[in-house]
């Protein structure tokens, strides 16, 4: 796969049909990686997914018309937690894995979150070492563990809680500007991203308001990245 052919951008209601398809594929193929279920979301029409795209910030990695991966951003509910955002709903198709698509999606969400939040949080299944390494490289720090956070069938999954301090990230980048292009605490050997990441900064909600995790899928789900999706 040629990474230069991949564009990462914020999805719109016009992408609802293909967003619904890849979302359901993720829920069906990797049920242990999500808080929501295929059974509940497969009952929703495309119009429901269009509304989710209208009221939330969800990014997609596209190669032409094909949607290869998705990742979402939502605010915490409540005035006292409105400074915190969630990275949720990550999924990358099998044919696009190990190509940097997952990283580009996370970077797009980070770029967007920096304009709207002070802290970006996520959770990841504790035995998902590839994802934990990815987040650490991008500056996320582990701050907690939720035992038996998810249950799929008879199996329980612990989740690691991670956060990225966006304020500190801004300070670090200002200090390092003179040293050349460096992203999210990466070493000087960082090289320009091979695919076109377009994190358009526009109002989160349809009327310019702040996004909230109103949909049942976003209320219970933050990023639970399948190890194969990195």
Regions found by a protein language model. Give the residues of each.
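Conserved catalytic-core motifs of GNAT/GCN5-like acyltransferases
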Residues: 121-125, 136, 141-158
